[in-house]
């Protein structure tokens, strides 16, 4: 099941089109958009396609420009950064092992939650400023215990260790808390995110209960609140 409401229809169509492209057959969807489609916790607007193999940057960039009218903003040895139909698309070689089976849901190839979670921990370790990375870990902990995430992290990135991941999760001085997160359901306060991360580090085997209100629940709650307000404004019975 995919939470398609987390991604604009045009973006979702573009993801499928890119992943059907034979030139991009070695790439898989990762990052926040993959997590949003799997978890349904927030909206996401970017497309991150990663491979664990080298690729010809010049050839792929040229193909994207011709086939998709991509506006390529920059390239690296193993990376392309571009916009397609105003959607930011990053195409990168991430040369670390894919540890779990690649999943295909509704034509979309994605890495496992464990693999993406390990990549999120690595991102926080080296750039702990992005609020959405902490939000994503908060939501992942409703599905996978931190112990499993850090074990995968350490296996994928053998030069780091679990303690480094714990330290990164608990260091928040660089987090840009003013960044806007478009949550699905209720907004999650920063203090609640911090509390969960702290508890997860202490109790690594915990899987946390979801504190989010799903859209259907939210609609039902609003209706109940309106009914309650109407009842509260009735005049006295005579």
What are these language model-derived features?
Residues 1-238:
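Compositionally biased terminal segments of proteins
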């Amino acid at each position: 099941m995919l939470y398609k409401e987390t991604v604009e229809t045009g973006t979702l169509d573009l993801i499928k089109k890119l992943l059907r492209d034979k030139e991009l057959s070695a790439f898989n969807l990762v990052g926040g958009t993959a997590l949003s489609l799997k978890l349904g916790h927030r909206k996401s607007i970017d497309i991150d396609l990663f491979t664990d193999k080298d690729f010809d940057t010049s050839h792929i960039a040229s193909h994207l420009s011709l086939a998709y009218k991509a506006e390529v903003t920059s390239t690296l040895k193993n990376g392309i950064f571009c916009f397609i139909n105003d959607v930011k698309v990053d195409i990168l070689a991430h040369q670390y092992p894919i540890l779990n089976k690649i999943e295909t849901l509704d034509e979309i190839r994605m890495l496992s939650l464990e693999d993406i979670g390990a990549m999120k921990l690595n991102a926080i370790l080296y750039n702990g400023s992005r609020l959405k990375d902490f939000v994503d870990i908060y939501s992942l902990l409703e599905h996978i215990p931190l112990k499993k995430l850090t074990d995968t992290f350490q296996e994928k990135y053998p030069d780091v260790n679990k303690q480094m991941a714990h330290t990164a999760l608990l260091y928040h001085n660089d987090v840009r808390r003013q960044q806007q997160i478009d949550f699905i359901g209720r907004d999650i306060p920063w203090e609640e995110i911090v509390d969960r991360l702290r508890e997860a580090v202490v109790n690594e085997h915990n899987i946390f209960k979801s504190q989010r209100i799903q859209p259907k629940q939210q609609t039902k709650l609003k209706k109940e609140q309106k009914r309650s307000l109407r009842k509260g404004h009735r005049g006295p019975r005579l």
